[in-house]
Design a protein with these regions (language model features):
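Non-catalytic propeptide/linker segments at domain boundaries
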Residues: 1-15
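Active-site mouth of glycoside hydrolases
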Residues: 13-307, 319
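Catalytic-core region of carbohydrate-active enzymes that cleave or remodel glycosidic bonds
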Residues: 154, 263-283, 290-291, 298-317, ...
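Generic recognition of flexible, low-complexity loop/linker segments
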Residues: 159-161, 258, 270-273, 296-300, ...
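Flexible internal linker/loop segments at domain or repeat junctions
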Residues: 319-337, 616-624
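Long, low-hydrophobicity ectodomains and other hydrophilic envelope-associated domains
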Residues: 437, 446-648, 652-656, 677
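Surface-exposed loop/edge segments in extracytoplasmic proteins
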Residues: 661-669
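C-terminal beta-strand-rich structural cap/linker in extracellular carbohydrate-active enzymes
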Residues: 671-686
Length: 686
């Protein structure tokens, strides 16, 4: 198949040693060669034997995937080790390895666990509640948790006899998924009394070490007390997170300092435990957001520096509401069609919001990963996603983009018992992986200049002074007047988040005075015209219209509102289409520029929808689902013309390919390519 990218992967994962970190990048330890990961969360639960996994691995390699994040519990409903899960994970690693795909292991998520009322080592739960935060302070839980890792990493495979501990195809491990002391779930309503008493006693002990006594601590706080404060038992309670990051009292600062130290120590001790087992792969702490991106966000990231790289999660959602809308799409649900290329708010009737998961500052010269991300269904603009991630991931020199979720290896609208909003195996998503994976993995878009260097003083962060560049914090268009206009950032100002669409940002945590070195962004960002140009000159975004133009030597194209864009003249090609929403991109397959390449892929996509899906308009920006639809997927008929400018364009043969990348017939030459309504890929050769 002309779209088969298996050749990008190693002969087998680990061929060049374990994945390591050097100079802020992932590298092959044996060669020192940098590597980026275009990845998926998966495989799904459909595979029950090695053959299923091997077929899935071959499919993923074809579409440019070189890493899977296998997100699966290794424990049963009581928190005891499940040996079958260990065997399944081993089978996944072995199958992926054969196709040059690494595996990243994620085995604990609080939402997978609901301790029963009489649980022997997690007291106080009711069989319905999740143990948020408990892993970070409960020693019995930590001992059990470490037993899970010991069993998973040291049990020999029944197939190969190898331990995962010794397997270079294991990219790394994640300490915990989506939990933090600084997220809203850390609240007395979510933590039972028996567990609160444990951590309140720890806080009391911490305060005694700092102040000499609890009386002295309360005096330093002007005597303010909470109902749960019990000094006679050495216990001190916690104010709600909202109060901490808004009121920033002396008590709040002490509380945050204690929680930060406890969370960081948990990560440090877990890393030490895993290294003590002999684990040679990478370790990351967690990936969660916080109740305050401005105040708690940088502290969360600072706690993650105990690991080898910094991870995060982020979804581009679509105002989806209804019963169980957090994990399913059902009749009666409502949603909005929302364009990321226009920075539309979840409700597009509201002002633009300049926030997106692709925004990726690098912390402490460590690699970055986004281990869960997607544009959620049923948004018609979902087809913007693959090129958006690839282009801006490459511009910011992001190290790993892990799409959520590969929930089945068939092109089905409903892979499981319900229709979910993250399904990756769709024409608009996986169908655009060939060109997107090439752009990202091969660096066909150059990294941008470093436009901001931010030094955050650790003591200031613990003093709740925050950061001028909060990650995952929405800034609406009405606030753009408040961003710095030159190179000076005044206290309280936010750096323009559009900086991420122009170049790179580095953040360091320091002991010396904090500072911000900011480039003048006026040559890249034009708020009046609503445009952003990359510092490389290869990318331009017209966010007023919703059009992305890519003009790099080895990758050129246009994405978004093609009809509104009109004829688009790029360096080596000309594109014209009346599609309201479309994505047309050419990439070279021989590492030569478009101007001289002898082998190119032209990839075309518009929007997808399920057959028989029906909606009704609730208001101008909100729709209600009448019928979620059925198989098969449909793609809007494609339309347009692509002309290559090079002198030998008429000598370049153009072959239309089917959906699997196999030739179906000649369609002339590259002097003028009239797009066929049902063709997504064209091979251009000489």
């Amino acid at each position: 198949s002309a779209i088969d990218l298996r050749r990008l992967n190693e002969k087998f994962a680990g061929e060049h040693g374990f994945i390591a970190v050097a100079s802020g990048q992932f590298v092959h330890s044996a060669s020192g060669q940098p590597v980026r990961f275009w990845a998926v969360n998966g495989p799904s639960g459909e595979g029950r034997d090695g053959g299923d996994f091997r077929r899935t691995a071959r499919l993923l390699a074809k579409y440019g995937v070189n890493l899977v994040r296998h997100h699966r519990a290794v424990f049963d409903k009581d928190g005891e080790l499940n040996p079958e899960s260990v065997r399944r994970i081993q089978a996944v690693v072995e199958a992926m390895k054969a196709e040059g795909i690494y595996t990243h292991l994620s085995i604990y998520f609080p939402l997978w666990f609901t301790p029963r009322a009489d649980h022997p080592w997690l007291k106080g739960y009711d069989g319905k509640s999740h143990p948020f935060a408990a892993l970070m302070f409960n020693p019995d839980f930590q001992a059990k948790y470490r037993g899970w890792w010991r069993a998973l990493l040291t049990t020999p495979s029944e197939t190969t006899g190898r331990r995962l501990l010794d397997e270079p195809a294991v990219f790394g491990v994640e300490v915990q998924n989506e939990d933090s002391f600084f997220f809203w779930t850390f609240d007395a309503k979510n933590i039972p009394d028996e567990q609160l008493r444990l951590i309140e006693k720890m806080f009391g002990d911490w305060l005694r070490r700092k102040y000499g006594s609890l009386d002295a601590a309360f005096a330093a706080w002007d005597g303010a007390k909470l109902n749960r404060d019990t000094p006679a038992e050495g216990r001190v309670a916690f104010r709600p997170l909202w109060n901490m990051f808004n009121e920033k009292t002396a008590r709040d600062k002490d509380t945050v300092c204690f929680l930060f130290e406890l969370q960081t120590r948990f990560y440090q001790e877990t890393v030490a435990f895993l290294r003590g087992l002999g684990f040679k792969g990478l370790i990351t702490a967690s990936n969660w957001s916080t109740a305050s991106p401005e105040v708690f966000g940088p502290l969360e990231k600072l706690s993650y520096t105990a690991g080898d790289f910094i991870d995060r999660h982020g979804y581009f959602e679509c105002n989806h509401k209804g019963d169980n809308a957090a994990w399913s799409i059902r009749n009666g649900h409502t949603y909005s069609d929302r364009s990321a290329l226009r920075f539309e708010a979840p409700d597009p009737a509201k002002p633009r919001q300049f926030v997106h998961p692709v925004m990726d500052p690098h912390y402490d010269n460590k690699p970055s990963m986004i281990s869960e991300t997607t544009f959620c269904r049923p948004n018609r603009y979902r087809s913007e996603a693959p090129l958006y991630y690839a282009v801006y991931g490459a511009l910011q020199d992001s190290d790993a983009i892990v799409h959520f979720a590969f929930d089945g290896s068939r092109w089905g609208v409903k892979p499981n018992f319900w229709m979910q909003q993250w399904t990756l195996m769709t024409p608009a998503m996986m169908g655009q992986f060939p060109a997107a994976a090439l752009i990202y993995r091969r660096g066909l878009v150059s990294p941008g200049q470093v436009l901001a260097e931010i030094k955050l003083n650790k003591a200031d962060l613990l003093g709740l002074k925050g950061t001028p560049l909060p990650q995952d914090a929405a800034l609406d268009e009405l606030r753009l007047a408040d961003v710095p206009r030159g190179v000076e950032v005044k206290p309280g100002q936010r750096i323009d988040p559009l900086i991420h669409y122009a170049g790179r940002v580095n953040v360091q945590f320091v002991d010396e005075a904090g500072s911000t070195k900011l480039a003048d962004l006026t040559s890249f960002v034009d708020h009046a015209k609503r445009t952003v140009t990359s510092s490389t000159g290869e990318i331009s975004l017209d966010y007023g219209t919703g059009v992305l133009r890519l003009n790099a030597p080895c990758a050129q194209g246009v994405s978004g509102a093609l009809k509104a864009a009109g004829p688009v003249d790029l360096k080596d090609m000309h594109v014209n289409s009346s599609l309201e929403l479309g994505h047309i991109v050419a990439v070279t397959l021989d590492d030569q520029p478009l101007a001289t390449s002898r082998l190119l892929l032209l990839q075309v996509m518009t929007e997808e929808r399920e057959s028989n899906r029906q909606t009704e308009q609730v208001n101008p920006t909100v729709k209600r689902i009448v019928s979620i639809g059925t198989d098969p997927w449909q793609v809007r008929a494609l339309e347009g013309t692509v002309r290559f400018k090079r002198a030998d364009a008429a000598m370049l043969k153009v072959t239309a390919l089917d959906f699997n990348g196999y030739a179906v017939g000649s369609v002339g030459n590259a002097d003028e390519i009239r797009l066929q309504k049902n063709t997504l890929y064209y091979l251009i050769s000489r």
